[in-house]
């Protein structure tokens, strides 16, 4: 793989899920990689082991003699000292999505987009292709134990990428197969209206070449709405009977889901996946549709998906015991994702009391979706709301917005036993009382709530 005369790449925010995947791919492809991040941890340690020079914190001196600087949407280029230093030196500065687009030129690209389910669907496709002997190159915005990380450098013709719609990043990619797994209002800081979001997904679909294909889930009303704007071949999947590829007879047992699939009204095969929930059936259908488009044998699709073992922070079971609780950690941070996770927990473990522990992510999202979060959480037996994780936002810009808005919305939606804890230590102390048999604690959020799930799992392990 060559990028002109580029030998050294510096990555600002190298510890982020998407950025670390690019760094890993570049390292495994023979490039020199340097990078910086405000914090260090497991991800940056792994990159260092692979040969990257990683700096903690941002400094002009970190840029060095690199050939290009890459940054993510989370970085503000107008104020970041490394980006300003690179521009002063005349070093090209590009966003993550532009680098991804360049890396895709060397492969036949499969890009998975959608407001929900991207990470899991991408990992399912990757697992299926690896099991089929296709040796794909893979980049995912999450950690897969099967893949031993978020990136795989293969020698086959396919490159499978999670395509992010935030900041219209996915429009820089060059897919041969474009998957649209879901679509609803999201990222109000990028898309002022739902029409803008729809138009972006239509542009993404039409970015495939004339010989390519769009694969989309028609169970989502907004997806059904945009297909009329496609000018490329497309096929549909879903639980809806109008779909070309349809799942039926869905059965959820603990951490497994079983279902049958029909293709063009004829039975295709029966499938099993080692993750719970109807939302994961959608993800699996997308992978099956991709495999069919590639011409893979049906038996390879069945065995490939059976090998999928889930993703970290996607309904990840951190602790389980018949003599104690089940503790689950999930990345859900949108109302639809929260609702899907709660339903999966209730369907898989009907005998257990489900305690939904939710940390809102972003003040703006909390303000926009507080009511919807309340309805999504109301299916749990108990609800605990943590303080908002601000991420890129300044709390001072959002007076009056707190997690209590979500707690009150859950009460209005009919949830019982709703509590709000601004302080994480108080939340942990409260939850410790529920580390008993018959309970399932479902931690949800894209922030540091995952740390409390880990501490609860450690508490239960030490006590057992």
Curated annotation (Swiss-Prot):
What's this protein's family per the entry?
A: Belongs to the MurCDEF family.
The job of this chain, per UniProt, is described as: Cell wall formation.
Q: What GO biological process terms are annotated to this protein in UniProt?
A: cell division; cell wall organization; peptidoglycan biosynthetic process; regulation of cell shape
Which residue spans traverse the membrane?
A: none
Q: Which Pfam families match?
A: Mur_ligase, Mur_ligase_C, Mur_ligase_M
Its UniProt pathway annotation is: Cell wall biogenesis; peptidoglycan biosynthesis
Q: Name one GO cellular component term.
A: cytoplasm
Q: Where in the cell is it found?
A: Cytoplasm
Give the species this sequence originates from. Answer: Prosthecochloris aestuarii (strain DSM 271 / SK 413)
| EC number per UniProt | 6.3.2.8
GO molecular function term, any single one: ATP binding
Enzyme class, spelled out? ligase
- Name the UniProt key words of this record, in alphabetical order: ATP-binding, Cell cycle, Cell division, Cell shape, Cell wall biogenesis/degradation, Cytoplasm, Ligase, Nucleotide-binding, Peptidoglycan synthesis
The name of this protein is: UDP-N-acetylmuramate--L-alanine ligase
Q: Which domain of life is it from?
A: Bacteria
What HAMAP family is this protein classified in? MurC
Q: Does the keyword Ligase apply?
A: yes
Q: Which reaction does it catalyse?
A: UDP-N-acetyl-alpha-D-muramate + L-alanine + ATP = UDP-N-acetyl-alpha-D-muramoyl-L-alanine + ADP + phosphate + H(+)
List positions binding ATP: 114-120
């Amino acid at each position: 793989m060559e990028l002109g005369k580029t030998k050294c790449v510096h990555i600002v925010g190298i510890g982020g899920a998407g950025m670390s995947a690019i760094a890993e791919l570049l390292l495994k492809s023979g490039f020199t990689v340097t990078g910086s991040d405000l914090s260090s941890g497991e991800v940056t340690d792994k990159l260092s082991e692979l040969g990257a020079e990683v700096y903690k914190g941002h400094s002009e001196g970190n840029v060095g003699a690199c050939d290009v600087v890459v940054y993510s949407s989370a970085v503000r280029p107008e104020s970041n000292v490394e980006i300003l230093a690179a521009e002063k030196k005349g070093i090209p500065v590009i966003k993550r999505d532009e680098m991804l687009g360049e890396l895709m030129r060397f492969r036949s690209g499969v890009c998975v987009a959608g407001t929900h389910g991207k990470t899991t669907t991408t990992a399912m496709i990757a697992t299926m292709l690896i099991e089929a002997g296709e040796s794909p190159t893979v980049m995912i915005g999450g950690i897969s134990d099967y893949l031993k990380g978020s990136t795989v450098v293969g020698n086959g013709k396919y490159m499978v990428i999670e395509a992010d719609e935030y900041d219209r990043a996915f429009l820089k990619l060059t897919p041969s197969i474009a998957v649209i797994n879901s679509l609803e209002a999201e990222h109000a800081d990028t898309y002022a209206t739902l029409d803008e979001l729809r138009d972006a997904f239509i542009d993404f679909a039409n970015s495939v070449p004339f010989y390519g294909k769009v694969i989309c889930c028609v169970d989502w009303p907004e997806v059904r709405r945009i297909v009329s704007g496609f000018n490329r071949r497309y096929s549909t999947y879903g639980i809806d009977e109008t779909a070309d590829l349809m799942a039926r007879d869905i059965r959820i047992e603990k951490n497994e889901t079983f279902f049958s699939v029909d293709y063009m009204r004829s039975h295709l095969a029966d499938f099993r996946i080692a993750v719970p929930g109807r939302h994961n059936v959608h993800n699996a259908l997308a992978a099956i549709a991709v495999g069919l488009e590639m011409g893979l044998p049906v038996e390879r699709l069945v065995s490939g998906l059976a090998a999928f073992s889930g993703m970290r922070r996607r309904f990840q079971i951190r602790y389980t015991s018949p003599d104690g609780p089940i503790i689950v950690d999930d990345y859900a941070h949108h109302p639809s994702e929260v609702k899907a996770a709660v339903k999966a927990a209730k369907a898989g473990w009907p005998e257990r009391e489900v305690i939904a522990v939710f940390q809102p992510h972003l003040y703006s999202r909390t303000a926009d979706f507080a009511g919807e979060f309340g309805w999504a959480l109301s299916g749990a037996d108990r609800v605990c709301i943590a303080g908002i994780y601000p991420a890129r936002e300044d709390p001072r810009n959002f007076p009056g917005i707190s997690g209590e808005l979500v707690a009150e919305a859950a009460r209005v939606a009919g949830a019982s036993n709703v509590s709000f804890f601004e302080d994480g230590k108080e939340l942990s102390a409260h939850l410790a009382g529920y580390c008993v048999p018959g309970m399932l604690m479902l931690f949800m959020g894209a922030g540091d709530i995952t740390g409390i799930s880990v501490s609860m799992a450690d508490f239960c392990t030490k006590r057992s």
